[in-house]
């Protein structure tokens, strides 16, 4: 800068200092009014706001101490005790000062602490523009901008237009030199040029891009600084409470060291070995088991896939193999051994009771001999005549009835198919069975429990309130014991029992938390899912990485290290017990060497030969048998598929063939021979007991003659009347009962389908209904009554131990009151505060922390997501925010603070800048002078803002009431509960965990209520009945739509 211009500025400064000294000697300071809560104008020189003071005197101002609280701002920082008295016009001031010329550097003006300015009147002639003048009247001072020239007070030197630095477009001057700033740039101590919304560092000349911020280092994007040093945290990283280690993604550290656990990893109980996916370690050592592997009970041999060990040794059985009771012979598929020897029976075969004859397919033996019955054959009540298909037995004997069978009311014979029970006995009921009210008989299907005992309930079972019986399905636990809870289990408040699915940790122990686990405040337990680190280690966790127990080597993906070194294993790899050889997939090594076995391979007992698939070795040599092959007892002939050999030679029988009892004739398919000769019967044929007449298909003969009965016909006990289908006769007469019907014990009332009668009357119960033990109230579906009253429990409800309150689905009550906990809720150890989803309580109080929240080290303020605390107080910074150098002012995105010469602003005010605007948190809506909101467009145009107060908008944070926000791009959904967010995330991931369990149905759903609604299609359940026309519907919305036909509203 020209030395003459600097000299002129010094002369002006001396002039004002002289005026201040004169006024100090002559004037007294008036009493100062209360200071106003106003923020002085803080803008660049070219946007300074001038207010007309013509013909009026400004009110006196009290002493105002302006002290910068940040000692590291470069440049000359002013500390002044500025006292301003009422201004009056000075007639001697006749010179002008150009608005186009600005003093913009602290270094150019040497202020003197304690200086005062009095008796100065600024009188603008009009609203200032680029070419207008502002006249400042003072003695012996004239500054003119006529013809773009500048005259200094101390000389006649004239600065021409070419000598004045030109500011183009949106450029402005820095406060320390001639550097030009573009756009929203600002600088403090150097000549560095900042572009497009940059902020500046406090101690260096480093350039920051975009929404960067920093303390003393560079922070990019959403980075933030740790509270104890300058470590940079990216994205969702967090640091440990005792060090500067950065955590990535879902990482956490182990409780005993610096090992990093990634994804779903956990460590072993005896060391720091990392387990991947579904891995676990053996009970005797730290050997890692991959996939479905397990070890034997006597050694550490690894079993792959579906292998199990024999009871007498460590031989590995593959697939569906099992061993015989007398030796270690391997049985394949559906094979089993005979009771008298080691003969192998193939799929569907069984032995006769008198010998080792093999029965193939659906064959059974007659009661008088070893004749084989094929298909659905049975014998008559007077002999060994074979009955086929859906045949039934006469009512004069206890012979078994097939397909569609029912029992007479005079005996306890088994009823097949849709059997029901008589009311006079405790016989087992099949299909949709129910129990009587007088006994503890098992109930099948949709069983429910009687109120007088603790019998096991199947299906959607629930437990009684008087014992700790196991509950299946969506079980819940009683409040009086620590029984294991399945499905949506929760923990009782009296013990450290394991909680499954959606588990949370109790506050009294270090129990493992599954799913979206968090750690307890009293221990270093491993946390899964959205894990965080314990306070005892500093290791960095990246993605799915973890470290080895002996060093800080980083393992990526599904890697794990060997027990003897730091070799990295990928995927499902494992190392051998004797070396570091890597095994891939389902590989394992032999017990005698390091040979690698692939897939379902296993080695022979005599050597290291590898057997593939379902292969096994013969008992006499090392020949490999494939698939379902086996060898004959007399030689090493190989039998394929369902083949077997005859007892007298090595003839091979194919598929369903069997030998006759008198020779080696081969019978094919369902053939059998007659009892008098070797005639072959085809298909379902049989011969009568009196001759060799052949009966075809479903035919049979009556017991008194050779009359042929077709299909499913049977004769009555009093004559030869033919009964069709599933018909049977009653015990008191010839009334015909149709398929599924039965008689009551007190009369001839017909019961249809699965009906049964009550113990006190002839009321018919439908489907899965039953009656209560104290009255004839009908319970439908899965309902049951409480032991203390007749309150009806629906679905999976259970009652509390202290009252009759009904608990739904996965609910449980607290140990101190009857408060109901829903879903994954649990209570704290010190009070009944309810924790939802992934919440956990702080170590100093019962405040609930959501999702990825953590507590600050100095107080109970909650930090969300990528928030960090400022180094001086508990202010939370979001995303790209940074704090000002000396106070709680928050800068967002590309914001910056500006300083105006002559009207300096301290950096201790509690105000914030949003985007290109500036606002105050205090009195933001009041039109006080100095509380002006300037648009960034004013800076770009280089114009002064108009003299009016613009309304400022407060920063609104909708995430406060809905802290769980969807992280997918372009999705702005947020929820107040974590479980709601998890359900929503399934729309993005396509996850459908609720699968229909009906055979042949492949439907899957994201929500349980959708699955329950779908199941009604299979069951045919239509519980919603129209009160007008008696039509029923499976869904309530269908009933509402139907109600419009009658012009009524449902429920009215």
From Swiss-Prot:
Asked whether the keyword Zinc-finger is assigned, the reply is yes
Disulfides per UniProt: none
- The molecule here is called Kruppel-like factor 18
Q: Which Pfam families match?
A: zf-C2H2
InterPro entries listed in its UniProt record: Serralysin-like_metalloprot_C (IPR011049), Znf_C2H2_sf (IPR036236), Znf_C2H2_type (IPR013087)
Q: Name one GO cellular component term.
A: nucleus
**Where does it live in the cell?**
Nucleus
UniProt-listed PROSITE patterns: ZINC_FINGER_C2H2_1, ZINC_FINGER_C2H2_2
In alphabetical order, the GO MF annotations are: DNA-binding transcription factor activity, RNA polymerase II-specific; RNA polymerase II cis-regulatory region sequence-specific DNA binding; zinc ion binding
Family to which this protein belongs: Belongs to the krueppel C2H2-type zinc-finger protein family.
Q: Where would I find the C2H2-type zinc fingers in this protein?
A: 964-988, 994-1018, 1024-1046
Which GO terms of type biological process are on file? regulation of transcription by RNA polymerase II
What keywords does the record list, in alphabetical order? Answer: Metal-binding, Nucleus, Repeat, Zinc, Zinc-finger
Which domain of life does the protein's organism represent?
Eukaryota
**Main subcellular localisation:** nucleus
Q: Tell me which PANTHER family the record gives.
A: KRUEPPEL-LIKE TRANSCRIPTION FACTOR, KRUPPEL-LIKE FACTOR 18
Q: Which residues form a coiled coil?
A: none
| Designated gene of the protein | KLF18
């Amino acid at each position: 800068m020209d030395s003459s211009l600097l000299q002129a500025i010094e002369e002006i400064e001396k002039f004002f200092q002289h005026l201040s000294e004169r006024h100090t000697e002559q004037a007294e300071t008036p009493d100062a009014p209360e200071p106003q809560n106003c923020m002085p104008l803080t803008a660049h020189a070219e946007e300074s706001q001038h207010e007309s003071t013509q013909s009026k005197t400004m009110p006196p101002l009290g002493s105002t101490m302006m002290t910068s609280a940040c000692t590291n701002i470069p440049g000359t920082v002013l500390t002044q005790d500025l006292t301003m008295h009422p201004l009056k016009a000075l007639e001697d001031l006749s010179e002008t000062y150009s608005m186009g010329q600005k003093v913009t550097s602290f270094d150019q003006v040497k202020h003197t602490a304690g200086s005062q300015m009095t008796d100065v009147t600024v009188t603008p002639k009009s609203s200032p523009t680029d070419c207008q003048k502002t006249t400042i009247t003072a003695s012996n001072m004239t500054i003119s901008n006529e013809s773009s020239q500048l005259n200094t007070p101390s000389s006649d030197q004239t600065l021409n237009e070419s000598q004045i630095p030109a500011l183009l477009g949106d450029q402005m001057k820095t406060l320390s030199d001639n550097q030009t700033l573009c756009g929203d740039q600002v600088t403090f101590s150097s000549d560095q040029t900042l572009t497009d919304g940059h902020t500046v560092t406090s101690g260096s000349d480093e350039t920051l891009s975009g929404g960067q911020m920093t303390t003393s280092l560079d922070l990019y994007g959403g980075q933030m600084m740790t509270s104890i040093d300058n470590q940079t945290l990216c994205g969702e990283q967090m640091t440990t409470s005792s060090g500067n280690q950065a955590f990535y993604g879902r990482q956490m550290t182990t409780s005993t060291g610096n090992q990093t656990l990634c994804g779903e990893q956990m460590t072993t109980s005896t060391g720091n070995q990392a387990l991947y996916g579904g891995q676990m370690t053996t009970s005797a050592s730290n050997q890692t088991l991959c996939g479905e592997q397990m070890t034997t009970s006597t050694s550490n041999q690894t079993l792959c896939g579906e292998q199990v060990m024999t009871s007498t040794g460590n031989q590995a059985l593959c697939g569906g193999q099992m061993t015989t009771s007398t030796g270690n012979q391997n049985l394949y598929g559906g094979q089993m051994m005979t009771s008298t020897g080691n003969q192998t029976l193939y799929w569907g075969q069984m032995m006769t009771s008198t010998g080792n004859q093999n029965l193939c397919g659906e064959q059974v033996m007659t009661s008088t001999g070893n004749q084989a019955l094929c298909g659905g054959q049975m014998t008559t009540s007077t002999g060994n005549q074979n009955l086929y298909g859906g045949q039934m037995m006469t009512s004069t004997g206890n012979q078994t009835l097939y397909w569609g069978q029912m029992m007479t009311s005079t005996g306890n014979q088994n009823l097949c198919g849709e059997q029901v029970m008589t009311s006079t006995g405790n016989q087992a009921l099949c299909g949709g069975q129910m129990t009587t009210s007088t006994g503890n008989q098992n109930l099948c299907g949709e069983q429910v429990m009687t109120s007088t005992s603790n019998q096991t309930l199947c299906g959607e079972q629930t437990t009684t309130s008087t014992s700790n019986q196991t509950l299946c399905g969506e079980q819940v636990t009683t409040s009086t014991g620590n029984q294991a809870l399945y499905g949506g289990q929760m923990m009782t408040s009296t013990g450290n029992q394991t909680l499954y699915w959606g588990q949370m940790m109790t506050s009294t122990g270090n129990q493992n938390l599954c799913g979206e686990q968090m750690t307890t405040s009293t221990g270093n337990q491993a946390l899964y899912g959205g894990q965080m680190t314990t306070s005892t280690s500093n290791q960095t966790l990246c993605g799915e990485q973890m470290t080895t127990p002996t060093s800080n080597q980083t393992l990526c993906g599904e890697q794990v290290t060997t027990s003897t070194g730091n070799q990295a294993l990928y995927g499902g790899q494992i190392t051998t017990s004797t070396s570091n050889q890597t095994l891939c997939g389902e590989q394992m090594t032999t017990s005698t060497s390091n040979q690698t076995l692939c897939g379902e391979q296993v080695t022979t007992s005599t050597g290291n030969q590898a057997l593939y698939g379902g292969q096994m070795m013969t008992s006499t040599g090392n020949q490999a048998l494939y698939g379902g092959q086996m060898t004959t007892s007399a030689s090493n002939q190989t039998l394929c598929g369902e083949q077997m050999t005859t007892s007298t030679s090595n003839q091979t029988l194919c598929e369903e063939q069997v030998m006759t009892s008198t020779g080696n004739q081969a019978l094919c398919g369902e053939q059998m021979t007659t009892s008098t000769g070797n005639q072959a019967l085809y298909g379902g044929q049989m011969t009568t007991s009196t001759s060799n007449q052949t009966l075809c298909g479903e035919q049979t003969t009556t017991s008194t003659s050779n009359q042929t009965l077709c299909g499913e016909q049977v004769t009555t006990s009093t004559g030869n009347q033919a009964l069709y289908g599933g018909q049977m006769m009653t015990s008191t007469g010839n009334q015909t009962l149709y398929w599924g019907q039965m008689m009551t014990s007190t009369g001839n009332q017909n019961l249809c389908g699965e009906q049964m009668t009550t113990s006190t009357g002839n009321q018919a119960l439908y489907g899965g209904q039953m009656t209560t033990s104290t009255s004839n109230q009908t319970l439908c579906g899965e309902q049951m009554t409480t032991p203390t009253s007749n309150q009806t429990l629906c679905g999976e409800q259970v009652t509390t131990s202290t009252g009759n309150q009904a608990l739904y689905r996965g609910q449980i009550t607290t140990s101190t009151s009857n408060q109901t906990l829903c879903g994954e809720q649990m209570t704290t150890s010190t009070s009944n505060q309810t924790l939802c989803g992934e919440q956990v309580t702080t170590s100093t109080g019962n405040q609930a922390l959501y999702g990825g929240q953590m507590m600050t080290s100095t107080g109970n303020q909650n930090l969300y997501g990528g928030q960090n605390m400022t180094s001086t107080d508990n202010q939370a910074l979001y995303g790209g925010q940074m704090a000002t150098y000396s106070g709680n002012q928050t800068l967002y995105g590309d914001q910056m603070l500006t300083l105006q010469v002559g009207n300096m602003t301290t950096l201790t005010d509690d105000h914030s800048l949003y985007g290109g605007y500036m606002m105050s948190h205090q009195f933001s809506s009041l039109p006080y002078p100095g509380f002006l909101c300037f648009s960034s467009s004013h800076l770009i145009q280089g114009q002064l803002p108009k003299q009016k107060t613009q309304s400022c908008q407060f920063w609104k944070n909708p995430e406060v009431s809905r802290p769980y926000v969807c992280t997918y791009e372009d999705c702005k959904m947020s929820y107040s509960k974590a479980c709601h967010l998890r359900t929503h995330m399934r729309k993005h991931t396509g996850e459908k965990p609720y699968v229909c369990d009906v055979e042949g149905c492949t439907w899957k759903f994201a929500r349980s209520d959708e699955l329950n609604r779908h199941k009604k299609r299979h069951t045919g359940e239509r519980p919603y009945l129209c009160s007008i026309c008696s039509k029923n519907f499976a869904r309530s919305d269908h009933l509402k739509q139907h109600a419009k036909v009658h012009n009524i509203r449902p429920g009215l």
